[in-house]
Amino acid sequence: MAPEPTPVDAASLTYEAVIGLEIHCQLSTQTKIFSSSSTQFGAPPNTNIDPVCLGLPGTLPVLNEKVLEYAVKAGLALNCQIAPYSKFDRKQYFYPDLPKNYQISQYDLPIAHHGYLEIELVDDKGTARRKKIGITRLHMEEDAGKLVHAGSDRLSGSAYSLVDLNRAGVPLVEIVSEPDLRTGQEAAEYAQELRRILRYLGVCDGNMQEGSLRCDVNISVRPVGSNTFGTKVEIKNMNSFSAIQRAIDYEIERQVAALKAGEPIVQETRLWDEATQETRTMRVKEGSSDYRYFPEPDLGPIEVTAEQLAAWRAELPELPAQKRRRYESEWGLPPQDARVLTDERAVAEYFEATVVAGAPPKLAANWIMGDITAYLKEQKLAIEALPLKPAELAELIQLIEAGTISGKIAKEILPELLSQGGSPKALVERKGLSQISDVATLEAMIDEVLAAHPNELEQYRAGKTKLQGFFVGQLMKKSGGRADPKLANQLLAQKLNPGS
């Protein structure tokens, strides 16, 4: 007779999280997926509507071709297989913001599937670690409307609810990851990298505050080394990447604590509460929902020809990860600099144009990440609207490199250049700010400084050599900051130490 298995002490186990994300991305089309109504955000309630998105009798949907193009481009950028043949399906459920009582989505034949996204995690020492996250599928669907609850942020407890159908019929792609993520940091980086890619493509603006990118998290925990999935919990209501990370970190701790205490994990949907920094129960799931999918009879099959696929693939831009690696390998930038510069496509393009115009890459990176970024934040400007053009920034950097002006002078004229643009060289000439590099002129200035401070000169020659910095400061003051620092220090040392 086989011996009884030894009971496992749950409290002594080490656990790991298993995390997958479902991300809904609103496509940046001018009109809705199956009708001609506008997709403009912030319009007065129920003004961007039409008979099709209201589901009125006798109306027929027509697929917006731009939606298909954007979905395929997103699939290609995520290394997915593109289905040459796919279809739409009806997902049946009742909710007040769903006028047809079904949603047109894709079920068993999505437009893209079996892809991956590589994330890059940089530690405190600046070392990058890469991890490949599988993508199960990407499918197209229409959005539902929006409920506004009076007196509460949810249906329960509200006095009444209002329905705004402006969002009904807005085109979405839903991107479902494999459960390859293990931490809140990995999940947040995955979501950020996905948004970067979509924004580079121009297919989604990724604005989480406006709901253009919405993320649901599926999370369970299991003992390290186990291949069995634990009970899955879904988390909603996270409107920033930081919130995604914090919600996951909290939920991992909650589930591990429950298991170690011998308590079961309930399959449920939970909401992230930003005020309390906790997840709370929204609804308990008794089982998987039966949406009774069947093919959408009012829409024909979707075919993507080899010619279409080749044309759309040729239009893909260089993506963020490709840029980061090029900046590191070709231009020697540190990983963190490369990440900052490639976060926004417009910033990366500005940086590259500055380098092409003749600026050393590291110096261009420093100016863009420092003073220019600070100015853009202060003025709430996009870099595309910056008056200072890349070629003008390159000219400013070249003036410093050539010794025409000092870094201090460059900082002084930068505000005017940022607000008005124009040639830095012309501005320097107009203001008479060129660096003084003439030996005779500098020697005369040094003689005047030394003559004006005999006590300090006597102390210096008596051994208080730290006073050289004082004399340098006085010389820079006398020259209005225009003295060539390197040459000035050299000449000053000769004057202070005659005969040495």
From Swiss-Prot:
One of its GO terms (molecular function) is asparaginyl-tRNA synthase (glutamine-hydrolyzing) activity. Gene3D superfamilies: 1.10.10.410, GatB domain, N-terminal subdomain (1.10.150.380). Keywords: ATP-binding, Ligase, Nucleotide-binding, Protein biosynthesis. It catalyses: L-glutamyl-tRNA(Gln) + L-glutamine + ATP + H2O = L-glutaminyl-tRNA(Gln) + L-glutamate + ADP + phosphate + H(+); L-aspartyl-tRNA(Asn) + L-glutamine + ATP + H2O = L-asparaginyl-tRNA(Asn) + L-glutamate + ADP + phosphate + 2 H(+). Coiled coil: none annotated. Its EC number is 6.3.5.-. The keyword Protein biosynthesis applies. InterPro entries: Asn/Gln-tRNA_amidoTrfase_suB/E, Asn/Gln-tRNA_Trfase_suB/E_cat, Asn/Gln_amidotransferase, Asn/Gln_tRNA_amidoTrase-B-like, GatB, GatB_C_1, GatB_Yqey_C_2, Gln-tRNA_amidoTrfase_suB_CS. It comes from the Bacteria. GO terms for biological process: glutaminyl-tRNAGln biosynthesis via transamidation; translation. Allows the formation of correctly charged Asn-tRNA(Asn) or Gln-tRNA(Gln) through the transamidation of misacylated Asp-tRNA(Asn) or Glu-tRNA(Gln) in organisms which lack either or both of asparaginyl-tRNA or glutaminyl-tRNA synthetases. The reaction takes place in the presence of glutamine and ATP through an activated phospho-Asp-tRNA(Asn) or phospho-Glu-tRNA(Gln). Heterotrimer of A, B and C subunits. Belongs to the GatB/GatE family. GatB subfamily. This is Aspartyl/glutamyl-tRNA(Asn/Gln) amidotransferase subunit B. It comes from Thermosynechococcus vestitus (strain NIES-2133 / IAM M-273 / BP-1). The lineage of its organism: Bacteria, Bacillati, Cyanobacteriota, Cyanophyceae, Acaryochloridales.
